[in-house]
A protein has these predicted regions:
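Acidic donor-diphosphate engagement hotspot in glycosyltransferases and nucleotidyltransferases
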Residues: 46-47, 74, 95-100, 112, ...
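C-terminal subregions of glycosyltransferases and related glycan-biosynthesis enzymes
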Residues: 204-338
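A conserved acidic beta->alpha catalytic loop
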Residues: 40-49, 66, 90
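Conserved donor NDP-sugar-binding/catalytic core segment of glycosyltransferases
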Residues: 98-130
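N-proximal low-complexity "stem/linker" segments adjacent to membrane-targeting elements
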Residues: 1-27
Protein backbone atom coordinates (compact mmCIF):
# COMPACT_ATOMS: atom_id res chain seq x y z
CA UNK A 1 0.00 0.00 0.00
CA UNK A 2 1.42 3.41 -0.99
CA UNK A 3 1.86 6.44 1.17
CA UNK A 4 -1.17 8.56 1.94
CA UNK A 5 -1.56 11.83 0.08
CA UNK A 6 -2.13 13.80 3.29
CA UNK A 7 -0.89 13.43 6.84
CA UNK A 8 -3.25 14.94 9.41
CA UNK A 9 -1.20 15.88 12.46
CA UNK A 10 -2.95 16.31 15.80
CA UNK A 11 -1.16 16.66 19.15
CA UNK A 12 -3.30 15.81 22.18
CA UNK A 13 -2.86 16.92 25.76
CA UNK A 14 -5.72 16.37 28.21
CA UNK A 15 -8.34 16.95 25.51
CA UNK A 16 -10.88 14.45 26.82
CA UNK A 17 -13.98 16.73 26.69
CA UNK A 18 -13.58 17.54 22.98
CA UNK A 19 -11.49 14.72 21.56
CA UNK A 20 -14.23 12.57 20.05
CA UNK A 21 -15.60 15.50 18.07
CA UNK A 22 -12.14 16.42 16.77
CA UNK A 23 -11.29 12.87 15.70
CA UNK A 24 -14.70 12.25 14.14
CA UNK A 25 -14.44 15.44 12.11
CA UNK A 26 -11.31 14.07 10.42
CA UNK A 27 -12.50 10.50 9.96
CA UNK A 28 -15.68 11.82 8.31
CA UNK A 29 -13.88 13.92 5.69
CA UNK A 30 -14.98 13.62 2.05
CA UNK A 31 -11.29 13.21 1.19
CA UNK A 32 -10.17 9.79 2.44
CA UNK A 33 -6.56 9.32 1.29
CA UNK A 34 -4.89 10.35 4.53
CA UNK A 35 -3.01 9.05 7.53
CA UNK A 36 -4.05 10.50 10.87
CA UNK A 37 -1.08 10.92 13.20
CA UNK A 38 -2.26 11.49 16.75
CA UNK A 39 0.45 12.17 19.34
CA UNK A 40 -0.57 11.94 22.97
CA UNK A 41 1.70 14.40 24.76
CA UNK A 42 1.65 12.82 28.22
CA UNK A 43 -2.04 13.30 28.95
CA UNK A 44 -3.28 12.45 32.43
CA UNK A 45 -6.99 12.24 31.54
CA UNK A 46 -8.88 9.70 29.38
CA UNK A 47 -7.40 10.94 26.11
CA UNK A 48 -5.45 7.73 25.43
CA UNK A 49 -8.48 5.56 26.13
CA UNK A 50 -10.58 7.62 23.71
CA UNK A 51 -7.97 7.44 20.93
CA UNK A 52 -7.48 3.69 21.34
CA UNK A 53 -11.23 3.24 21.15
CA UNK A 54 -11.08 3.92 17.38
CA UNK A 55 -10.45 1.02 15.01
CA UNK A 56 -9.83 3.12 11.87
CA UNK A 57 -6.63 1.93 10.18
CA UNK A 58 -5.76 5.48 9.10
CA UNK A 59 -5.04 6.44 12.71
CA UNK A 60 -1.38 6.16 13.71
CA UNK A 61 -1.07 6.60 17.44
CA UNK A 62 2.10 7.78 19.20
CA UNK A 63 2.65 8.56 22.85
CA UNK A 64 5.16 10.85 24.51
CA UNK A 65 6.04 9.31 27.86
CA UNK A 66 6.53 12.82 29.23
CA UNK A 67 4.83 16.09 28.34
CA UNK A 68 7.12 17.56 25.65
CA UNK A 69 4.81 20.54 25.04
CA UNK A 70 3.23 21.55 21.76
CA UNK A 71 6.22 22.71 19.71
CA UNK A 72 8.37 19.62 20.30
CA UNK A 73 5.37 17.40 19.63
CA UNK A 74 4.55 19.18 16.37
CA UNK A 75 8.16 18.91 15.21
CA UNK A 76 8.11 15.21 16.04
CA UNK A 77 4.98 14.92 13.93
CA UNK A 78 6.68 16.67 10.99
CA UNK A 79 9.37 13.99 11.06
CA UNK A 80 6.84 11.16 11.28
CA UNK A 81 4.63 12.43 8.47
CA UNK A 82 4.60 10.37 5.29
CA UNK A 83 2.09 12.40 3.28
CA UNK A 84 2.76 14.73 0.38
CA UNK A 85 0.94 17.34 2.49
CA UNK A 86 0.63 17.83 6.24
CA UNK A 87 -2.66 19.18 7.57
CA UNK A 88 -2.80 20.53 11.11
CA UNK A 89 -5.63 19.74 13.46
CA UNK A 90 -6.18 20.83 17.05
CA UNK A 91 -7.71 18.38 19.50
CA UNK A 92 -10.41 20.80 20.66
CA UNK A 93 -11.50 22.02 17.20
CA UNK A 94 -13.58 20.69 14.31
CA UNK A 95 -12.72 20.32 10.62
CA UNK A 96 -15.73 20.66 8.36
CA UNK A 97 -16.31 17.71 5.98
CA UNK A 98 -14.78 19.11 2.76
CA UNK A 99 -11.77 20.78 4.38
CA UNK A 100 -9.10 18.27 3.31
CA UNK A 101 -10.61 17.82 -0.15
CA UNK A 102 -10.62 21.52 -0.93
CA UNK A 103 -7.13 22.17 0.43
CA UNK A 104 -5.69 19.14 -1.37
CA UNK A 105 -7.21 20.24 -4.68
CA UNK A 106 -5.88 23.78 -4.31
CA UNK A 107 -2.37 22.58 -3.48
CA UNK A 108 -2.38 20.10 -6.36
CA UNK A 109 -3.43 22.78 -8.86
CA UNK A 110 -0.98 25.37 -7.53
CA UNK A 111 2.47 23.84 -6.96
CA UNK A 112 3.91 27.23 -6.02
CA UNK A 113 1.78 27.24 -2.84
CA UNK A 114 3.53 25.68 0.15
CA UNK A 115 1.06 26.60 2.90
CA UNK A 116 -2.71 26.90 2.63
CA UNK A 117 -5.21 27.98 5.28
CA UNK A 118 -8.95 28.58 5.29
CA UNK A 119 -11.50 30.83 6.88
CA UNK A 120 -12.87 29.62 10.21
CA UNK A 121 -15.69 30.27 12.63
CA UNK A 122 -15.30 30.42 16.39
CA UNK A 123 -17.79 28.94 18.80
CA UNK A 124 -18.36 28.35 22.48
CA UNK A 125 -20.86 25.99 24.13
CA UNK A 126 -22.61 25.45 20.81
CA UNK A 127 -23.00 29.17 20.05
CA UNK A 128 -21.28 30.63 16.99
CA UNK A 129 -19.30 33.71 18.03
CA UNK A 130 -18.23 34.90 14.58
CA UNK A 131 -16.14 34.21 11.50
CA UNK A 132 -12.56 35.09 10.65
CA UNK A 133 -12.05 35.77 6.96
CA UNK A 134 -8.44 36.10 5.87
CA UNK A 135 -7.20 37.42 2.52
CA UNK A 136 -6.74 34.90 -0.31
CA UNK A 137 -3.33 35.54 -1.83
CA UNK A 138 0.32 35.55 -0.84
CA UNK A 139 0.86 39.31 -1.10
CA UNK A 140 -2.17 40.18 1.02
CA UNK A 141 -1.28 37.60 3.67
CA UNK A 142 2.35 38.71 3.89
CA UNK A 143 1.50 42.40 4.07
CA UNK A 144 -1.02 41.85 6.85
CA UNK A 145 1.50 39.72 8.71
CA UNK A 146 3.31 43.00 9.41
CA UNK A 147 0.61 43.78 11.97
CA UNK A 148 -1.27 40.53 12.69
CA UNK A 149 -1.20 36.83 11.92
CA UNK A 150 -3.26 36.24 8.79
CA UNK A 151 -3.40 32.46 8.41
CA UNK A 152 -4.89 30.23 11.09
CA UNK A 153 -2.61 27.53 12.46
CA UNK A 154 -5.35 24.95 12.92
CA UNK A 155 -6.44 25.30 9.30
CA UNK A 156 -2.95 25.00 7.84
CA UNK A 157 -1.92 22.48 5.19
CA UNK A 158 1.81 22.34 4.37
CA UNK A 159 3.61 21.01 1.32
CA UNK A 160 5.92 18.50 3.02
CA UNK A 161 8.69 18.88 0.43
CA UNK A 162 8.98 22.61 1.21
CA UNK A 163 9.38 21.92 4.93
CA UNK A 164 12.07 19.31 4.32
CA UNK A 165 13.93 21.14 1.57
CA UNK A 166 14.35 24.21 3.78
CA UNK A 167 14.62 22.47 7.16
CA UNK A 168 11.53 24.24 8.48
CA UNK A 169 10.26 23.41 11.95
CA UNK A 170 8.43 25.30 14.67
CA UNK A 171 10.86 27.39 16.75
CA UNK A 172 10.72 26.66 20.51
CA UNK A 173 11.95 30.19 21.23
CA UNK A 174 8.56 31.55 20.09
CA UNK A 175 6.17 29.66 22.33
CA UNK A 176 2.49 30.48 21.81
CA UNK A 177 3.38 32.39 18.63
CA UNK A 178 5.23 29.50 16.99
CA UNK A 179 2.86 29.44 14.02
CA UNK A 180 3.27 33.16 13.31
CA UNK A 181 7.06 32.79 13.49
CA UNK A 182 7.09 29.80 11.13
CA UNK A 183 4.87 31.67 8.68
CA UNK A 184 7.46 34.49 8.66
CA UNK A 185 10.08 32.01 7.45
CA UNK A 186 8.03 29.83 5.14
CA UNK A 187 6.59 32.88 3.35
CA UNK A 188 10.11 33.82 2.21
CA UNK A 189 10.56 30.53 0.31
CA UNK A 190 7.07 29.61 -0.93
CA UNK A 191 3.63 31.08 -1.55
CA UNK A 192 0.80 31.24 0.99
CA UNK A 193 -2.95 31.12 0.34
CA UNK A 194 -6.26 31.05 2.19
CA UNK A 195 -9.34 29.30 0.82
CA UNK A 196 -12.21 31.79 0.93
CA UNK A 197 -14.63 29.54 2.75
CA UNK A 198 -15.24 28.49 6.36
CA UNK A 199 -13.82 24.97 6.58
CA UNK A 200 -12.82 24.86 10.24
CA UNK A 201 -14.36 25.58 13.62
CA UNK A 202 -12.27 26.93 16.53
CA UNK A 203 -13.58 26.17 19.98
CA UNK A 204 -13.27 28.76 22.75
CA UNK A 205 -13.06 27.50 26.32
CA UNK A 206 -11.45 28.33 29.64
CA UNK A 207 -8.19 26.48 28.98
CA UNK A 208 -7.38 27.89 25.54
CA UNK A 209 -3.82 29.10 24.95
CA UNK A 210 -4.62 32.75 24.31
CA UNK A 211 -6.24 33.03 27.74
CA UNK A 212 -3.63 31.12 29.72
CA UNK A 213 -0.54 32.51 28.02
CA UNK A 214 -1.74 35.78 26.49
CA UNK A 215 1.20 37.87 27.73
CA UNK A 216 3.81 35.45 26.34
CA UNK A 217 1.90 35.17 23.07
CA UNK A 218 1.75 38.95 22.71
CA UNK A 219 5.45 39.41 23.49
CA UNK A 220 6.53 36.76 21.01
CA UNK A 221 4.16 38.13 18.37
CA UNK A 222 5.94 41.48 18.68
CA UNK A 223 9.22 39.68 18.04
CA UNK A 224 7.80 38.14 14.87
CA UNK A 225 6.58 41.53 13.61
CA UNK A 226 9.98 43.06 14.31
CA UNK A 227 11.60 40.20 12.40
CA UNK A 228 9.30 40.73 9.41
CA UNK A 229 10.03 44.45 9.30
CA UNK A 230 13.73 43.65 9.47
CA UNK A 231 13.38 41.23 6.55
CA UNK A 232 11.96 43.97 4.35
CA UNK A 233 14.77 46.26 5.49
CA UNK A 234 13.24 48.40 8.23
CA UNK A 235 14.19 48.87 11.88
CA UNK A 236 11.10 49.62 13.96
CA UNK A 237 10.29 50.23 17.60
CA UNK A 238 7.40 48.61 19.43
CA UNK A 239 5.62 51.97 19.33
CA UNK A 240 5.96 52.02 15.54
CA UNK A 241 4.59 48.48 15.30
CA UNK A 242 1.57 49.59 17.33
CA UNK A 243 1.26 52.69 15.15
CA UNK A 244 1.23 50.60 11.97
CA UNK A 245 -1.47 48.38 13.41
CA UNK A 246 -3.55 51.46 14.24
CA UNK A 247 -3.13 52.74 10.69
CA UNK A 248 -4.08 49.37 9.23
CA UNK A 249 -7.20 49.12 11.39
CA UNK A 250 -8.18 52.78 10.74
CA UNK A 251 -7.86 53.58 14.43
CA UNK A 252 -6.59 57.11 14.07
CA UNK A 253 -5.65 59.54 16.81
CA UNK A 254 -6.60 63.06 15.80
CA UNK A 255 -3.35 64.75 16.72
CA UNK A 256 -0.28 66.19 15.00
CA UNK A 257 1.88 63.73 16.94
CA UNK A 258 0.00 60.78 15.45
CA UNK A 259 0.20 62.17 11.90
CA UNK A 260 3.88 63.02 12.23
CA UNK A 261 4.70 59.55 13.56
CA UNK A 262 2.70 57.91 10.78
CA UNK A 263 4.55 60.02 8.22
CA UNK A 264 7.95 58.94 9.51
CA UNK A 265 6.91 55.27 9.55
CA UNK A 266 5.22 55.07 6.15
CA UNK A 267 7.99 57.02 4.42
CA UNK A 268 10.50 54.70 6.09
CA UNK A 269 8.53 51.76 4.65
CA UNK A 270 8.55 53.40 1.22
CA UNK A 271 12.36 53.46 1.29
CA UNK A 272 12.61 49.75 2.20
CA UNK A 273 14.65 47.55 -0.13
CA UNK A 274 13.81 43.98 0.90
CA UNK A 275 10.06 43.81 0.47
CA UNK A 276 10.21 42.15 -2.97
CA UNK A 277 10.87 38.76 -1.36
CA UNK A 278 7.22 38.90 -0.28
CA UNK A 279 5.32 41.04 -2.79
CA UNK A 280 5.68 43.06 -5.98
CA UNK A 281 6.66 46.71 -6.04
CA UNK A 282 3.26 47.72 -7.42
CA UNK A 283 1.34 45.85 -4.70
CA UNK A 284 3.53 47.21 -1.91
CA UNK A 285 3.35 50.79 -3.08
CA UNK A 286 -0.40 50.60 -3.69
CA UNK A 287 -0.98 49.39 -0.13
CA UNK A 288 1.18 52.17 1.32
CA UNK A 289 -0.61 54.72 -0.86
CA UNK A 290 -4.02 53.54 0.35
CA UNK A 291 -2.93 53.73 3.99
CA UNK A 292 -1.46 57.19 3.39
CA UNK A 293 -4.62 58.50 1.78
CA UNK A 294 -7.04 56.98 4.32
CA UNK A 295 -4.93 58.31 7.19
CA UNK A 296 -5.11 61.92 6.04
CA UNK A 297 -8.59 61.88 4.54
CA UNK A 298 -10.10 60.55 7.76
CA UNK A 299 -8.22 62.92 10.05
CA UNK A 300 -8.97 66.03 7.98
CA UNK A 301 -12.19 66.92 9.87
CA UNK A 302 -10.05 67.33 13.00
CA UNK A 303 -6.78 68.59 11.51
CA UNK A 304 -8.21 70.83 8.81
CA UNK A 305 -6.38 71.67 5.61
CA UNK A 306 -3.04 70.88 7.25
CA UNK A 307 -3.83 67.18 6.77
CA UNK A 308 -4.54 67.82 3.07
CA UNK A 309 -1.27 69.73 2.72
CA UNK A 310 0.71 67.05 4.55
CA UNK A 311 -0.81 64.38 2.33
CA UNK A 312 0.40 66.08 -0.86
CA UNK A 313 3.79 67.03 0.58
CA UNK A 314 4.94 63.40 0.77
CA UNK A 315 6.17 61.20 -2.11
CA UNK A 316 3.61 58.68 -0.87
CA UNK A 317 0.85 60.81 -2.41
CA UNK A 318 2.21 60.18 -5.92
CA UNK A 319 2.05 56.39 -5.68
CA UNK A 320 -1.65 56.22 -6.52
CA UNK A 321 -3.49 59.03 -8.35
CA UNK A 322 -6.37 60.66 -6.48
CA UNK A 323 -9.39 61.63 -8.57
CA UNK A 324 -10.23 65.34 -8.85
CA UNK A 325 -13.62 64.75 -7.24
CA UNK A 326 -11.96 63.03 -4.29
CA UNK A 327 -9.47 65.87 -3.93
CA UNK A 328 -12.39 68.31 -3.88
CA UNK A 329 -14.06 66.33 -1.08
CA UNK A 330 -10.74 66.25 0.72
CA UNK A 331 -10.50 70.06 0.65
CA UNK A 332 -14.13 70.47 1.68
CA UNK A 333 -13.61 68.21 4.71
CA UNK A 334 -10.65 70.39 5.66
CA UNK A 335 -12.66 73.60 5.36
CA UNK A 336 -15.37 72.10 7.53
CA UNK A 337 -12.93 71.34 10.35
CA UNK A 338 -14.77 70.76 13.60
Amino acid sequence: MGKAAVTVLMPVYNAEPFLNEAIDSILNQTFTDFEFIIINDGSSDRSEEIIKGYADSRIKYYKNEHNLKLIATLNKGFDLAGGKYIARMDADDISLPTRLEQQFELMEKNPEIGLCGTWYESFKDGEILGQVRYGPDHSTICFKHLFQIHLSHGTGMFRTSVLREHGLYFNPDFSHAEDYELWSRISAVTKLANIQQVLYRVRHHENEISKKYGDIQAANSYRVKEKLFNLIGIQVTREEMDLFQSIAYHKYEHSDKFLDGATVLLEKMLRAKGYEMFFSKSFYETMLAEYWFNLHYNTTPHSGLSAFNKFHASPLSSLKPVALSTNAKFILKGLLKR
